[in-house]
Amino acid sequence: MLHLLKKYAFKDITMSMLVDECRINKTTFYRHYSDKYDLIEKISKDYISLFSKASSNFVNGINVHNIDCLIQFFDDNKDELLILESKILPINIFEDMHAIMTLDLCTYFKKSINQDDLIKLYASLISNNILTTIKWYHKNYLNFERNQIIQIVLQTVETGLEQSITAIMKKGKR
């Protein structure tokens, strides 16, 4: 399926294309999947399961190791995730990732903050920031080293976006 998604829009992929690409007959395909929607959902769930393992570290905090593990997940699955992000699909794997990471961060914040709405807001904002930064890095990684991205994520989480940009601007004037 992912190989076909490199070339075609999801809506244009036919059952014949799938069975030809997989070199199986329709009976074998239908034994495992009800249709192409079921197949893409199962593919997505496989990546979500792997992501969940990497994200689960965030229940213990936001640090270099945890961000590095998340970047490693994206490195290991870069091509596939970029395909899943670039196409119009009946699933949104990145929304699912955001929801998982937000829950992990909520678990962490509940250890020291006692306001559920505030916890959910901050966890969602931080999760979006981390995931957006890592996705951007994987599209533009030639311009940045991995450690730079980790430091940018940490700095924006710890001090806020505006202060992070101001610090970078001050360094640039030296």
Where are the predicted features?
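Short hydrophobic clusters on alpha-helical segments that form packing/core surfaces
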Residues: 1-5, 51, 74, 101, ...
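An amphipathic alpha-helix adjacent to DNA-recognition modules
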Residues: 2, 6, 11-23, 30-60, ...
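Hydrophobic alpha-helical connector segments
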Residues: 54-82
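Short, hydrophobic secondary-structure boundary micro-motifs
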Residues: 14, 82-84, 93, 146
